[in-house]
Amino acid sequence: MASAAVQNKTPRKVLKKSTRDSLIAYSFIAPNFIGFCVFTLVPMVFAIALAFCAWDGRHAIEFVGLKNFVKLFTTDKIFQAALKNTIVYVIGTVPLTLACSLAMAVLLNQNVKLRNFFRTVALFPYVASLVAVAAVWNMIFNPSMGPINMILNQFFGVAAENLPRWAAGKDTAMITVILFSVWKNMGYYMVIYLAGLQGCNPDLNEAAELDGANRWQQFWHITLPQLRPTTFFVVIMLTISGFKVYDQMYMITQGGPGTATMTVVYYIYNVAFVNTPKYGYASAISMVLFVLVLIVTIIQFRGSKGEN
């Protein structure tokens, strides 16, 4: 009887202990989950609902259906220009940053003198204040007094009237911002590639060298395939950050000249917070951007699975 009583009590103790452990676990998760709901989930749901409405923050919310989306793709020339500029920016920054960061990582993964110093120098633009870095960049590419145009004029014979205006020129502003973004971000992705290179198997390179493969063949056929997971991560991060670009445009060109560097996120900010607020219309633009980024990311994931 005593043993039976002990057996009957034991499951209750185990149940109580498991319940207590679950409550402790949920208590650790709860703050993060509550923060996610309050600051991410609820605003997202509200933004989706607001995309089908017109609201300036002062008057009552008015349901307008698909009117905001119809306007975006039919009569809003600024949005269409911003969408085009954003796509151009992504196409320009992703491959350039990828190539530069990978090249730097491969070079600084070798046993060279002052390797750690050069790694730090390469990372400095990324960790430095964007305001300070943008100020230096504007000074370097100043159309009239910048050292780049001075070199072009004095050493390459480019006439003063033919010198590029860089951030102030309609045709060169986007190029300037793309170069700035590549220079600023390639140090960060270099570090990611360095971590990936540390995980590569050196025995494969040694075996290939014994078989007569040169450095380029070893890199192309052995090292690069081992870096596919790292490259996939870098491409995804660069693509998402490219579609969300705002800071660089604000600090370098303020979206100009005209709409030459106006991006979707910069336009969302202008619609929502500059002059007369149009929160419903800004939410509609945000939904379009979200769907676009989601589609591009899904395509990249499926492409990666196909390669694997």
Which functions belong to the PLM regions below?
Residues 1-10:
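Short, intrinsically disordered terminal tails adjacent to the first/last structured region
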Residues 9, 18-308:
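A structural signal for multi-pass alpha-helical bundles of membrane permease subunits
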